[in-house]
């Protein structure tokens, strides 16, 4: 049996020249900026031009581009190895805002001609701005390509045991390393959202807080307090908080 696993992720620029178009793709998404199309494209162009120079400087500190695709490819190969007893399994990165983007990934999966397709967003917490946006784009492109194989979606796992164990292990190592400088405090920092998105029913903030609570429970009496905070605020709207900068 041939099984294709679509690994959905945000994507990231692979070099300095990709930063501005990546940002434009991001802010052009109606799930991100919820205004009419003509205005959204204008705002996306304006925001991406303004933010690109600073973003290039940040990416320059880590080699000029995002490590997200190489890391996702490593996950894909590891997943294939773990599942090889199930048959011919291939995992395909499906990036939302930079290559390989959804149309490219759909074509590659169609060429693989799978008997089944598993849709696996790599976002532990569900949001209309991430998981839903990726799956909507997938459905549109898959229908256009005529992908007829049965599909199953594995969606959101904010308190899945393996995920929490891995997160807690990383936090534990960080806390122990920080003790040399004093009493540590744990900041669970997640990407923020406009408050109106959450008030409209998006479960993201609730699931982020579930993740943090589960990790702290797994850590037990670690001798450090914690706070959940949010980062990457953009624009004039009120965002969920507390903001990471104010917490720091």
Residue ranges, per PLM feature:
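Active-site-proximal alpha-helix that buttresses catalytic centers in soluble enzyme cores
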Residues: 1-248
